[in-house]
Amino acid sequence: MTAVTSTTDFDYEFDAAKGIQRNNLPPFAQRMRKAADLVWEEGYQQPFIRELGEGTLQRERFAFYLLQDFRYVNDYARVHALGLAKATDPEIMAFMLKVQNGALQVETEVHRSYLASYGITEEQMNNVRQSAFARAYTSNILSIAYGKDILDILVAVLPCAWVYADYGYRLAAEFADTLDNNPYKSWVDMYKTDEFWQDSVWLLDHIEKLVADASEERKRELIDIFVTGVENEYMFWASAYDMQYTWKPEWNQAR
């Protein structure tokens, strides 16, 4: 197996002629990625992601994740709907609409397919109890979508798009020899593609343009939004691995 690791150099000269690539990021994208690097790489090495790539992840853990993610995707779509309402640039409006529709149609179909094979009904999916970690994540991005401007919204939705594109790509390369027999192959297949990565490219490009005249204080605010999102991605998977609904496992006994 060939492991694909992230570059540790985030201070290189961006080659605009090549366009945005995984190893050719514009300056502000480099700053965001560098700021999140510790949690980003710990996220890729955490048990949920490793076992998913190996195909050894317990089905119960994956089902817990899928049910929580099913709820998350619906809120993610709402964030894009709010972004659509706030946007004045037709190109941004079109992107928000595209992602909203894709989240509700394409991604939820993968969830439904897996969950149906596990004997989980549509009613159970729609009535699943949201974990504290998932609720913290969605509450954060919804709060930004309601109370902030379009640039904040673009940065808030970037971690989900970028982390999934990166992890999917790296898992597909690292476990290429065994992926065909992996029960989670369709999950990896969905996120490994260049087509999925292009959503991140679009976001990175437009964020870069919108921060061009921003103050340093404003840029730091946006970096904080981004890093918080990457941290929430980490905890989303970690809590799914532990199948944990509450902040502390023992608190679940009172529910």
Question: What do these predicted regions represent?
Answer:
Residues 1-22, 249-255:
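Eukaryotic N-terminal low-complexity, Ser/Thr- and Lys/Arg-rich leader segments
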Residues 4, 223-255:
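Acidic, carboxylate-rich catalytic segments that either coordinate divalent cations
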Residues 6-14, 20, 33-57, 76, ...:
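Short alpha-helical hairpin
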Residues 19-20, 24-28, 32-33, 140-146, ...:
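Hydrophobic alpha-helical segments
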Residues 20, 91-198, 227, 231:
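Active-site-proximal alpha-helical scaffolds that flank and shape metal-associated catalytic sites
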Residues 37-42, 57-86, 106, 155-165:
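Alpha-helical bundle segments that constitute or directly flank the non-heme di-iron/ferroxidase center
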Residues 64-75, 98-102, 221, 225-228, ...:
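A non-catalytic, amphipathic alpha-helix used as a structural packing/dimerization or gating element
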Residues 193-226:
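Long amphipathic all-alpha helical oligomerization modules
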